[in-house]
Amino acid sequence: MRNDLSGREPAIGDNRGPGSTDGNATCAHGRAGPRCARSQPFDYLVVGAGFAGAVLAERLAAGLGKTVLIIDRRDHIGGNAYDEFDAAGIRIHRYGPHIFHTNAQRIVDYLSKFTEWRPYEHRVKAHVDGMLVPIPINLTTLNVLYGLHMTSVEARAFLAERAEALPDVLTSEDVVVSAVGRELYEKFFQGYTRKQWGMDPSQLDKSVTSRVPTRTDTDDRYFADTFQCMPAEGYEPMFRAMLSHPAITVRLNTDFREARNDFLFKHIIYSGPIDEYFDFRFGKLPYRSLRFVHETLDLPQLQPVAVVNYPDENVKYTRITEYKHMTGQCHPRTSISFEYPSATGDPFYPIPCSDNQALYKRYEALAQQTPGITFVGRLGTYRYYNMDQVVGQALAVYARIEAESCSGERSRPQSAIHREEEAMDDSPLRTATDIPSR
């Protein structure tokens, strides 16, 4: 079986599928599909070729010798981290900026098998009151914004005077107002969050902004993680290397419903939306989507940093990204993208609020009763993960599968949801003004 790479040279795998027939292989509907004679059973069908799916496909093939069919409904691997050269020859991220950062050495060690790294410390500025100032808020932000010359000690006192004491911190608004006061909340967070999430921060769970850093020194790095780098040749080549094992077959432009009718497999790893898998039985889980407008400009550089945020609600986009800052590419022109949040389109972000979590719990309970499938990733577990957290989750799921395989135990079909929280401890969760690691 050839790897379907939309006409490109099929460099992933060796273009062979598993050739033996296994009487234990199953199909959801028990009938042959039009694209396959059902003579090639797979140990695993992996749905989604982003981080969660690619890591598990690679580990199952290389670590346990399993045959894997990995599919994606899009025309490329890499999920939302996919990057490519645009018409001008500039490497861009099709779905907006993806900055790799982590405190987990085990995750760095794993991914380093598939890529070299380019050191990169991400910096973001916010367009506030007609000025570009660092975000997260730091000493420079405060001094520039207010025309002051404070020291770090004075800045701490400045923020303490403005912070509002609240009896309970329950929402995203509460988190920020209790830390920096209402004026800075309104300047930096309120409008941006309303645009990003389509909801007021007072309606969002406190987890959205619970780890927003505020600094009283001049550190203007967006992240404080010990490892901050970009794949030297890009994300797409890294994913290609991950999926190059001969036991892995890749099918693009392939919907899950097609694949489960057309192929034999023993177990499903599913990183798509959990509500979609169950045909929206309890209703749709709310997600935010994004629309990107990419442009190439006839100048070498547009802005001083890779990303500039626009918190003003009168500006319809949330930010502008200039990719050469991140990739280090030398080019006489520059490519940028405008980012517009949307209520419709591909699901990007689970919306964190109590009603949505209650709806997800109903799907989670249903998944726990469904044998033969493991739900992983941001969409499969309806949680807002960073890229490194998704890798950590996938490695933890694999470790469990490996342990059960070595001990002779059968995989736990009744335990279909795998968040693997211990894999998440090294990295903070997403924030309202964070750079999405989609």
Where are these regions (language model features)?
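N-terminal Rossmann-like FAD-binding beta1-loop-alpha1 element of flavoenzymes
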Residues: Y44-I70
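Extreme N-terminal leader/targeting segments of oxidoreductases
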Residues: M1-Y44, A62-G65, M424
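Glycine-rich FAD pyrophosphate-binding loop
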Residues: A61-A87
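Active-site/ligand-binding neighborhood in enzyme catalytic cores
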Residues: D129-H267, S271, F278
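Dinucleotide-binding Rossmann-like beta1-alpha1 core, especially the glycine-rich loop
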Residues: A88-R162
